[in-house]
């Protein structure tokens, strides 16, 4: 069986989920290819598109949120003959039995292609945040793999039958799902995703580092400026650049301070590491943060004026509270359906036969 996973590098979350999904499917002896969809449909302006995105989320989040909400209510995708031919060439060369989308733009374009050119194409989509807006939805999708029951309800409210929705969480590397090592007392991981972006953290870290019994591992991602800023600055801090071994640091930590990204959320859940969320400012992050609060698996700072450092220190001194958060994470894990696209595809083939 051949599987083609289409994604995009808006941040690193969607791409990371795709690589994790590839790892999972290859364990089922499936041939899997992960493709940045923007390499295919917009090869000449891809770099510009990503540069604008990175600028907006770091400097102009209000403008980003405006465009996010606009696209959330639209299934429009500019589709012309050139784009159709590029998609057709990709699908033909991949010889894929299944196409999986982990990014809504991919979902829009492949749904349009399927509707107009190839009704038999199997199209599955993995939604990589708790909130599922309309840009993820299409009648051409054969199966939705979603993060939570909350996501499932949102999909059903858009007219999708529950039989086409599987609650499996968001894909993470298998290492996050393996047995958890003993947590290190007062170990904190600070990370802002692959781009290493957490605004206004300097003051908080400065106060935390005054406590010699606290150790912080700062995962700077691809943010070289952040890496250089904190390298060798504090004796009780370890700074790590971009790494594929986030699980090593997260699984031994008592707490992770981070943004409310969907991938990081489920990495923390599988690691049973309580989450401390700095003020969420992107629309999809707000939905993830509300999920964290509702399920009591972490703390969300909504107001920038809050005394974050003192709050973190008090949380580390509250083992019962941290243990309760870990128990809630385990309950969320237990609710996830144990299935994947290979099993679903096999069931559909049997049904057709």
Specify the residue positions occupied by each region the protein language model found.
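Acidic donor-binding loop of glycosyltransferase active sites
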Residues: 251-261
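C-terminal "capping" alpha-helix adjacent to the active site of nucleotide-linked donor transferases
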Residues: 294-296, 304-321
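Nucleotide-sugar donor-binding and catalytic loop/hinge architecture
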Residues: 162, 175-190
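Active-site-proximal region of nucleotide-activated glycan assembly enzymes
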Residues: 115-167, 172-175
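Conserved N-terminal ligand/cofactor-binding loop architecture of enzyme catalytic domains
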Residues: 20-92
């Amino acid at each position: 069986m051949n599987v083609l996973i289409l994604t995009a590098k808006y941040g690193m979350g969607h791409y990371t989920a795709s690589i994790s999904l590839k790892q999972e499917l290859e364990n089922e002896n499936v041939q899997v290819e992960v493709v940045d969809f923007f390499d295919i449909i917009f090869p000449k302006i891809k770099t510009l598109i990503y540069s604008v995105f990175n600028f907006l989320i770091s400097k102009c989040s209000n403008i980003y949120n405006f465009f996010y909400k606009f696209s959330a209510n639209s299934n429009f995708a500019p589709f012309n003959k050139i784009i159709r031919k590029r998609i057709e060439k990709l699908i033909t060369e991949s010889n894929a039995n299944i196409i999986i989308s982990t990014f809504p733009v991919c979902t829009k374009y492949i749904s349009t292609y399927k509707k107009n050119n190839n009704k038999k194409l199997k199209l599955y989509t993995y939604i990589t945040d708790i909130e599922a807006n309309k840009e993820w939805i299409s009648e051409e999708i054969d199966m939705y793999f979603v993060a939570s029951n909350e996501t499932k309800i949102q999909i059903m409210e858009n007219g999708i039958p529950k039989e086409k929705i599987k609650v499996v969480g968001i894909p993470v590397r298998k290492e996050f799902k393996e047995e958890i090592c003993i947590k290190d007392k007062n170990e904190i991981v600070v990370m802002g995703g692959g781009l290493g972006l957490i605004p206004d953290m300097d003051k908080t870290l400065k106060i935390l580092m005054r406590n010699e019994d606290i150790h912080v591992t700062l995962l700077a991602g691809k943010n070289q400026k952040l890496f250089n800023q904190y390298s060798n600055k504090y004796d009780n801090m370890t700074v790590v650049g971009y790494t594929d071994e986030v699980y090593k640091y997260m699984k031994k930590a008592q707490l992770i301070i981070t943004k409310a990204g969907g991938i990081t959320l489920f990495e923390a859940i599988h690691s049973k590491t309580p989450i401390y969320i700095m003020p969420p400012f992107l629309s999809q992050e707000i939905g993830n943060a509300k999920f964290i609060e509702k399920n009591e698996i972490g703390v969300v700072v909504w107001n920038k004026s809050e005394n974050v450092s003192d709050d973190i220190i008090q949380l580390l001194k509250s083992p019962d509270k941290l243990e309760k958060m870990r128990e809630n994470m385990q309950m969320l894990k237990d609710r996830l359906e144990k299935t994947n696209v290979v099993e679903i595809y096999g069931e559909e083939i049997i049904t057709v036969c």
